[in-house]
């Protein structure tokens, strides 16, 4: 049996939140993408993420926002304190939300589900990125990258 060779526009190394969202955005722009990670188990993570209006639009555009089961909590008030000034700086808006709070784990879970449905997520691969990078510098807009 002959091995089939797949060609991709992008290889995303790391299926964490940033890698998964990057891959979904590239797919949305009709690029072929492969996402690899050594461990694709969801982390035991109860952290939350504050999402501003632009980020919310981005998540809607890649099809994630409406898939969240837990209703995002609106941010209606922001209090900024420091140890120099005694008075806090308070931003309050009762007319519209200034952002939302979502659970990292749920966002990552939904992103990974989409990647798995598209069959572009591979786990169990420990890739040494330095072994796949070009062996010469790359010039982009007058800057050298290696």
What are these regions (language model features)?
Residues 2-18, 34:
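Beta1/beta-strand and adjacent pyrophosphate-binding region of the FAD-binding site
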Residues 5, 73-74, 79-146:
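Conserved N-terminal helical subregion
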Residues 11-13, 25-47:
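Glycine-rich FAD pyrophosphate-binding loop
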Residues 20-21, 54:
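Short alpha-helical segment within the catalytic ATP-binding CA
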Residues 25-27, 58, 114:
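Residues within well-ordered alpha helices
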Residues 30, 63, 119:
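Short glycine-rich hinge loops at helix-strand junctions in the catalytic core
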Residues 45-82:
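N-terminal FAD cofactor-binding segment of flavoenzymes
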